[in-house]
Structures are given as structure tokens and as C-alpha cells.
Amino acid sequence: MAVRELCFSRQRQVLFLFLFWGVSLAGSGFGRYSVTEETEKGSFVVNLAKDLGLAEGKLAARGTRVVSDDNKQYLLLDSHTGNLLTNEKLDREKLCGPKEPCMLYFQILMDDPFQIYRAELRVRDINDHAPVFQDKETVLKISENTAEGTAFRLERAQDPDGGLNGIQNYTISPNSFFHIKISGSDEGMIYPELVLDKALDREEQEELSLTLTALDGGSPSRSGTSTVRIVVLDVNDNAPQFAQALYETQAPENSPIGFLIVKVSAEDVDSGVNAEVSYSFFDASENIRTTFQINPFSGEIFLRELLDYELVNSYKINIQAMDGGGLSARCRVLVEVLDTNDNPPELIVSSFSNSVAENSPETPLAVFKINDRDSGENGKMVCYIQENLPFLLKPSVENFYILITEGALDRELRAEYNITITVTDLGTPRLKTEHNITVLVSDVNDNAPAFTQTSYTLFVRENNSPALHIGSVSATDGDSGTNAQVTYSLLPPQDLHLPLASLVSINADNGHLFALRSLDYEALQAFEFRVGATDRGSPALSSEALVRVLVLDANDNSPFVLYPLQNGSAPCTELVPRAAEPGYLVTKVVAVDGDSGQNAWLSYQLLKATEPGLFGVWAHNGEVRTARLLSERDAAKHRLVVLVKDNGEPPRSATATLHLLLVDGFSQPYLPLPEAAPAQAQADLLTVYLVVALASVSSLFLFSVLLFVAVRLCRRSRAASVGRCSVPEGPFPGHLVDVSGAETLSQSYQYEVCLTGGPGTSEFKFLKPVISDIQAQGPGRKGEENSTFRNSFGFNIQ
């Protein structure tokens, strides 16, 4: 009574809300959909967005969800596509049993504004079950004086499928005594009757065995069989008679196992064996056989399994009484299950938000549904929350309730509420269900983020790797929730010439600073910028701080060799007299370092030599000197690789390559040996080759000049003609050198060579091409061949 008064006292508080909510529910519709049973999980049912006339993405924006009446999630909604899908395989027989059509009811809930769409899903049957007889053999005792046309009712087969997939026909194996007749029952089911066509004669045949077949209407059809054994008896005049054709009784659903449901009674006026009556279930389903049992001698029916009103609220039981002579009679027992208050109310929360802003009155916090599986007064419910709370329960349709704030909340007075939702039924004794929820009151955004320091100084060594973490900034916010979530950003620099966006970046979530590229101390020694911290409140509040970045110098410059040049041009060859004394200064490697301090201190080291021990390099000045006397057995050509290393950490280095040629005096001309020349040629053979080569070059030069003049005089009109000449083969040609680097002269170009000599020097000088019309061959090839020539021999072409 107190609960009912409490409910009435709140009616006036929620009346205006109920009326307001009725406006939002006025557009709610009713949807009917269908799906075939046993379809795979995730099968498409319908596109709810199109069916409800909503734009794409609207379902997700409104927080749409699907709620079933029995709290089982048979369906799944993809709110992004709007597709309603099956969440599991649906078995119509398990869901609805023999009931047809099989309907599942559910609701579609939507927010902003809150709406409920009621819908139903029909599960269409498929022929996935074959008919099954409970008894594989049925025994009929028929007297031999039974009249033709007498019908004997047989137990029907069971088929969980419904409609056309259920049982549609019965047949009997061919015989001369019986045929099958199909009859209907009050429940709309068909059952077989065995009709006698010809009188039986016990003396001719005492027993017959027939096969009864049940056929369903599926495609393809399924069938089940049972054996009917007929025993022919002597004359039995009277069949048993029940005291009542219909027995009606009631049983509470909490009745214990073994509880006596009812006792049926039948009498037979015959005597002896023909008067002995036995009782049995007839045409009973498996559910009846597992729930009840019958005493075959007394006719008492007992409870074999506990009853459940919520599953089955009534039973129809067919009882057969048969005497010893095979005659039988039937009656029906109707058992009504009485409901007891054995199910507490259920509370199903569909949506819940545990946080509400302090300045948000009449805000929905939770949507839930209540249900009680009991019936009558046992299934009636009241729902309420504690007194003195700034919240209201607003009733809706289909037993839905919405928990909303009654007015604006004050976080400074109370930041958290523990609400108990109580649902009580009106049964005896009363059962109740409680559900506790916690609501947090969130603060408004009234505090700006504050940096831990007003300015930050960061140090980073130059040549850092890109994306290097160089430091962090941090800010805190006194608010809570999203108002306290800080986002960091780089503010535009005051120096417009500073490319800040390409220098550093900041992690928006944690304030970590990263160098976007490698910094160069020589280019940029320091820079500063400002960072901002902004919360996620509305409106957003922010603050800023100064960040200074100092770049530290590093040993990032390798030594650079000034002499000899190492720029890819032809190598420079130094001449060394064979008469040089030990310690003779051959040349000096000159190098510089762009760094400063100890990073620029250079040391020299001989890394590789054609003949180790012949030359040495001074460590501090790079001078290359002979280490011992030269002999005739020493190779004429030598290649030295000098390592130049600075004193940085880690040290950096460069190499210089020197080409040395041992000569017997500076007055003799020399020619750098091609790479293919033997490195171990004897000195005397080299001298002979040089003399022969010089003579050959002189002769060929003179012959070329004469040939050129002759061709010019004979063919004045052909300015682009090219002179030809033969060049003797050999490792050292005479006065002609092939600019392509081969041992014979190219067919495209010939050059005049002038060999000049002076004290201590000797060089080749190319005056001009013998063929003047170079344009006919193409400027590109000229440049390419000249470049190849210079790179191969290091000579200057004029």
C-alpha cells in the first residue's frame, strides 16, 4: 500500500513530462519483418534507415539500439549502414514450438528525441525435421467378430515443423484387411485411423504386421515410419467406458514432483481377462510424456517434472483405457497450471549515461524497461527511486522508463549521486528488484590550463635524427572530465623568417616536442617559440609558454683535402727521382676541417701503398717523404692512399689518393701508364718503349698534317669530312692519344700533341683537333669524349 501511495505521489511530478513525451512518441510506428530460420549469423533482415525514412548516418547519430522483449539479443543493428542483421542462427522450433506463425517482438529505441518503434520479426519455417513416431511399434488387439468399417485410431507422428512442412498425410503398407483414413482433431491436427475392410479370422491368421508412414508437405518431403502389429482375438463383447469424457483439474506451478494431478477411471462389464482395464497415454507429445506419468492399473496421473507457468500454462492429455480383449476407450484430461509469484521483476537498462553537466536540467540519464513474467496481480509492477533526489522517473510506453534530472545540479554541493531504482510486483509475497546506478556531476569549464613553467630551455645536439624527442612541456587544468583534457599546439612564431613548422612539432596529447629534421649548428645556433595549451571545454580556455632551443655543436664536418684535388678529375701524378735520398719530400697533403676546437685537429696516416715501406707520411703536417733509398727494382708507378682524421668524438676522416712516378731525371718526358699496363715492368724495357713511342708519335704527327692538307685541298666542298689515319698498336702510342681511353685512336677525333720540357717539369700540351669540323660529329659527343679523356689522364685540352 505504501508503494502504491508513493507511486501516486509522484504522478503529479511526472504528468507534464509524460504529456511532453507523448508528443515524441506520437510518430512511433510498427514494423513487420521476416527471416527464414537457420540462416547464418549476420544475415540481412532489413535496412532500418530506409524503412524508417532516415538519412544515412542518422541511426548512429541518434544512438539507435534494438531491445527484445525477452532480453535475448536475437538481432544486431549496424548503426552505420542501417542494416538489421541476425545475431545468431534462429531455430523456429526452439523459439515457438508448434505455434504458427512464429513471431519475435522487439523495440527500436532512438535518442534526440527519444522514440520507440515497435516491431515484430516472423521466423519462417523450413522443412528441417522429419516426422517421428513416439512408439516404434503399436499393438492393436482386434476381436475377430469386429464389423467391417470399424475404425481404430492410431497415435499420430510428431513433426516440429509447422504449416505445409508439418505432417500432411499417412499411408499404410499394402494389405487386404485395412486402409488408412485421415481425420482431423479440434486442435486442427490430423491423425490416422485404421479402418477394417475385411472381417478377421483368427483361425486363418492370428497376427498381422503393417507399416504406418507419416509424410510431411515439405519440398522435398520427409517421412517417418512405425510398425502396427495387429493381434486377432476371440470375441470380446464390451469395450471399457470412462466415467467422464473430460477431466478438468488445476495444479500450482510450484507443485512438487510426484504430486497427484488427477485419477481417471474406466469400467468394463465383461468378465475375466476382457474386464481387465489398463491405462496409458494416447497420442501424447514428448513434453507430456516427460512432464507426467500414469499408473497403468489405477489411472492415477502424477507429476514427473516441475511445472513452469511461464513456459506452459495448460496441458491437454489424451488417456486410453484398454481391456484384455483389445477394446479401448479414450478420454481427455485438461490440466490448468496456476501461476504463483515465483518470478521477481526484471529491469533491463537499454542506455545509461553516468555523467551530467551541472548546468543541464531535465537531461535523460538512463532508459530502462521493466518486466514480470508472472500474470495477474503477480505481474503488475510499480517503479520508484529514493526521495529527496533531484531526479525523476518518467514512464513511457511498453513498460519503458526514463530517468532524468529534475533541475540544474550543483557540482560544488554534490559531485556524485547513488540512485537505487526499485521495481516491486503486487503479488503475495511481494518480490522486488533493485538496480543501483551512480551519476557523476561534471563541472563547467571555468579553469584555464596552467603550464608548470612560464618558459622552458631545451638543448639539442646538431645532426640529430629526425623525429628526435628533444623535451616536453606540461600543463594542468583544475577542471574535471573533458574540461581537464589539455591539447598542446605550436603558436605562430614572432620571427616570420623562422621556419618553425619544419623545425619542431609537438604531440597534441602529451606535450612532447620533436625535432622534425636534422639541425645544423653552423646554420642555426638557437631559436625560440611559444606553445599553447587548450582544454576541450566549451568555450575552450587556453594559456601559453615560451620555449628556447639551444643547438649544441657536434663533429659533423669531415676533413676536406685541398691538395691533391679529390674532386673526381684526373689524378695528379708526382715525379720522384730514383736518386732521392731517404726523407726526400715528395709532396704534402693539405686538408682543412670546417669544425672548430679539437674537432678541427687533423692527423695524417698512410692507409695503403703499392709498396709498403717505401714512402711515409708525417702525422701532423701531411708531408709525404721517402722512407728508404730507391732501387732499380722498385716499380715505376706507385699509388698511395693517405687517411686524414680529425680529433672529434666520434672522429671523422677523409682520404687522399696520390700517384707517384719514379723517373731517372726530370728532363725526360713521361706519360702516365694506363691502368692495364703491367705494374711490374722492368725499368730498362720502359725506357725503350718510351723512345719508340716518341719516334712513332712524331712520324704519325707529320703524316697526319700532310694527309690533312691533302684532303682539304681535294675536298673543299665537304667541310664536314673526317680524315682517317692508322695508328700502330702498342701499349704506348706515339704522338696520338685516344681520348676515349682505348689503346688505339678513335675514328672521330685526332689531336696534335706538343711535348714540352723544362727543368723539373714535363707535360703534354694538346693544341687543337686535327679535324676542324667537329660540329658534324655532334657537340654532345665531343664534350663526353673530352671529359673521358681528362678523367683518364689528367691532361688539359686547349
Curated annotation (Swiss-Prot):
Lineage: Eukaryota, Metazoa, Chordata, Craniata, Vertebrata
Residues carrying covalently attached carbohydrate according to the record: 169, 418, 436, 567
Keywords, in A-Z order: Calcium, Cell adhesion, Cell membrane, Glycoprotein, Membrane, Repeat, Signal, Transmembrane, Transmembrane helix
Membrane-side (Extracellular) residue stretches: 27-690
Organism: Pan troglodytes
Sequence intervals crossing the membrane: 691-711
Name of the protein in question: Protocadherin beta-10
Keyword Transcription regulation included in the entry's annotation: no
Cytoplasmic side: 712-798
Source superkingdom: Eukaryota
Any one Gene Ontology BP term: nervous system development
Membrane topology annotation: Single-pass type I membrane protein
Signal peptide: 1-26
Single annotated GO MF: calcium ion binding
Domain Cadherin: 35-133, 138-242, 247-347, 352-451, 456-561, 568-671
Main location: membrane
GO terms under cellular component: plasma membrane
